[in-house]
Amino acid sequence: MLNYYFGGNMIRDLGWFWFLSGKEDILDEEKCGKWMYFFDDQEFAQKICQKAIDEGVCYECKCSDMEITRQPTGVICFYLNGDDIENHKRVIQFMMKNDLIRKTKAGKYYNNSFKFDNQTRAGEYGADFEGKIKLEQFIDLRTGEWIYE
């Protein structure tokens, strides 16, 4: 498959649209992971990835290429190092501001997990995946208020 390059920081390759900040070398293979959002609107996904990069939220972001994968849904991944607390806060704030964290019928945020790339490489998906970092470590799931500043 051919690689497609768009603009200065977007690459279309192998079923993904990658959005790069120019600082992706900061990501450490052993510490890197992602917060995820599942979508069904390709245009929205690409715009939100570009917005995340433009606003300095993460170093790298990607979304599924639904045309290539031929799936009705896709995933957005916001990449950062797992030990970078300030970057977790930036990504979580961005996700909350852009309504990318689902809520229960009672209005409580779902306790999403951060997924390390090592877990992805090990094939941890679905019931086999256990998040080591969870949203509840950063915010009160009922109110959305930060647990610590």
State the predicted function of each range.
Residues M1-E149:
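Structured alpha/beta or helical-core interaction and ligand-binding surfaces enriched in interleaved
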